[in-house]
Amino acid sequence: MKDVQNQPDNRNIYLQRVGIRNLQYPVTVMDRNNGYQDTVATINMYVDLPVNFRGTHMSRFVEVLNRYRLGIDPKIIKNMLEELRNNLNASVARVEIEFPYFILKKAPVSSIESFLKYTCRIEGQKTEKLYEFTMSVGVPIMTLCPCSKEISERGAHNQRAMAWIHIKSKKMIWFEELIDAAEQAASSPVFTILKRVDEKFVTEHAYDNPRFVEDVAREIAVRLNRDERISWYRVEVESFESIHDHSAYACVMKDKED
């Protein structure tokens, strides 16, 4: 059959990225407590396209993914990208994988168990000589305003917030380690199920640990600075303010190899 993609192209324009986007696909990811966890990811896969080819072979992206979708980790991603480069005659290959990740948590007093969802993301890019791997996690947390507590006779405004941690590391790091860093930096973690005794504990704990978004970002950064495995990070914290019509935001970035 005629291979239209391999037809020559005379426009002499190099394309930095071609591929597939927003593919919903079952994958298996590493889980610190259970070994592995099955989930459904949203996946983007790209390669570059030389000036002399009209198109890439879209079906090959999913064929390669099928061979590597079980047991996603940094080494698997590296091998997947190298196979993409070879199969598609590309100099650069990139993959972005985002998925819900569930952890079983106990309520702080009643110890009732329920799953809490975190949003995890893995990005990898490979050339002939360079391999870059970034992992990210979005952690739902609670913040209580220190200023509101200071000036109010009764209570203080509090709200849910989201902490995003993005890292590059030299050695294996679990998503759970980043989640712990975010939850420990917050006024309080959040939970899917809370009974009355748990609600009392959470609200009082948050009141005793007031945090601006700036505080949360800095507390997470302190923990990441201590971890010698991490070579680069970006921390973003967004608080969905309960008494304002806007969010509060803080961000800190550091390349520890500079």
Swiss-Prot record:
Matches recorded under InterPro entries: GTP_cyclohydrolase_FolE2 (IPR022838), GTP_cyclohydrolase_FolE2/MptA (IPR003801)
Cross-referenced Gene3D superfamilies: Urate Oxidase (3.10.270.10)
Keyword Hydrolase included in the entry's annotation: yes
Site (May be catalytically important): C145
One of the GO biological process terms: tetrahydrofolate biosynthetic process
Keywords, sorted A to Z: Hydrolase
Enzyme class: hydrolase
Pathways involved: Cofactor biosynthesis; 7,8-dihydroneopterin triphosphate biosynthesis; 7,8-dihydroneopterin triphosphate from GTP: step 1/1
Signal peptide (from-to): none
The EC number(s) this enzyme carries: 3.5.4.16
GO molecular function: GTP cyclohydrolase I activity
Pfam families cross-referenced by the UniProt entry: GCHY-1
Catalytic activity entry: GTP + H2O = 7,8-dihydroneopterin 3'-triphosphate + formate + H(+)
Family: Belongs to the GTP cyclohydrolase IV family.
Function: Converts GTP to 7,8-dihydroneopterin triphosphate.
Stored NCBIfam families: PRK13674.1-1 (NF010200)
Official protein name in the record: GTP cyclohydrolase FolE2
Organism: Pseudothermotoga lettingae (strain ATCC BAA-301 / DSM 14385 / NBRC 107922 / TMO)
